[in-house]
Amino acid sequence: MAWRGSEVEAGAGDASRARGRLAAFRGELYRCLTARADELFELGDAVLCSDGPVRVLAGLSLVPGHRRGHGAVYDALNAGRVDVPRLRWAVGAVPLPAWPDGRIRLAADVCAWLRPEARTSPERLFCHVHGRGRNAGQMIPGWPYSFVAALGPGASSWTAPLDTVRLGPDDDATQVTAAQLREVAGRLERAGAWRPGDRDIIVVLDCGYDVIRLAWLLADLPMVLCARLRSNRVFCAPPAPKPPGMGGPPRQHGAPLRFADPATWAAPAVTGQASTARYGTVQVAAWNRMHARLCKDTAWEHHPGTLPVVEGTLIQLRPARLPGYRELKPMWLWASGPAAGPGEVAVLWQAFLRRFDIEHTFRFFKQVLGWTAPLLRDPAAADRWTWLIIAAYTQLRLAAPLAADLRLPWQRPQDPGTMTPARVRRGFRAVRETVATPAAPPRPCKPGPGRPKGSKNQHKAPRHDVGKHTTKRWKRTKRRTRAKQAG
């Protein structure tokens, strides 16, 4: 990126370099806003300079430094334009969290912008929301967004969001995630964050992803996928050699390993234990070259020829304790590396534990930055607002070394390098005064005529259904299920 050179020339001191990086990113962000740029830029600053959590979008027009009215706020989101490919490059050019081994850890997850009452908003899907009780989850209409973020070492509430894509009614979540990870990996390589010869990038996922299919789609990339599995899964070992003289095709599946049946667990290839502060002593076991049986009735329906055998490393974690007095159950992970040694197994499961840091980022987006606060009708406007939130969070990452600890009297002091995102946001207004603001002041204008007094709206917005568009495969599977239930 062009702005990366300016950050190096910003000065000799650490504070000067950090201020130069922040100013350069803000300038590049402004150039990514191709329509309503001034208002969109000031809107992002208002999110960061607000005294408390963002509750109402129009209330950002009252934040000091915002020079336009509340009508301009919604007009910018509805009629503005954001050069998303260029903004992706700007966000990816920011230095990633550094690990001691220099290896990059990424996390992919889906977070929903719930819109249950927005009947006039198109492209809403049913999003799963966890309840407090057991089996209390609900399916609520909303816009699901797939995020990819870089993780940092140690317990931290910081991540580095790199990309987001809204899932539509016609999208296959696995294919969208694969394309998203492929694009992020290529962008990191072109930006110099990953170079040929470096160790493979680790991507951690939750159990909602089809990690087997993802590993097959991304087999040509220097990437290791590590995902949590549900406790009812069954995996197979490599097949044993056929006895001499026995005909027929070669075997594809060996002895099954059922997660719910310990009697089927063969001797693991890797065993060990590690001490953690949160989970106590964790017992680790790993089986190499384990694969799952694939079926043509699922997403592999249109796969040409024989279904592939995607081998990986199966990892079992047995913690000594869990937060919240929950029942102790083993956690199962599957990594796309077929034969991981003890060191690689430890790196993989410890990287997966850092996946929960992205939950802090989602909570900060919603509860503090007001990601889901606007009542927007157009999903394109929601996409613009989402990228503004990511750009605002990136500015907090760059401003972390510069922000003062403006703590409340009952809060503990924090060092500049360890402040939380909420604490950095509290001091961002003072940091903003030390860097340039490329947004131009508003020009004087007169209000428009508006709707004539006493007239009613004659063009009502259309109503839209919720959910994915049905396919022939889904209908055929539904018929088969009904036939089996009938007898």
Model-predicted segments: where are they?
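Generic alpha-helix structural propensity
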Residues: 39, 52-55, 68, 72, ...
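A generic secondary-structure signal
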Residues: 46, 63, 93-94, 184-191
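Short, basic, glycine/proline-bearing loop/turn elements
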Residues: 74-80, 197-200
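Gly/serine-rich nucleotide phosphate-binding loop at the start of the catalytic core
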Residues: 2-78
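Active-site-proximal, Lys/Arg-enriched surface segment
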Residues: 47, 76-156, 161, 165-166, ...
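Single, function-defining residue in the core of a domain
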Residues: 1-33, 119, 155-487
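A residue-level signal for conserved active-site and pocket-lining positions in enzyme catalytic cores
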Residues: 60, 148, 391
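Short glycine/proline-enriched coil/turn segments at helix->beta-strand junctions
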Residues: 53, 101, 220-223
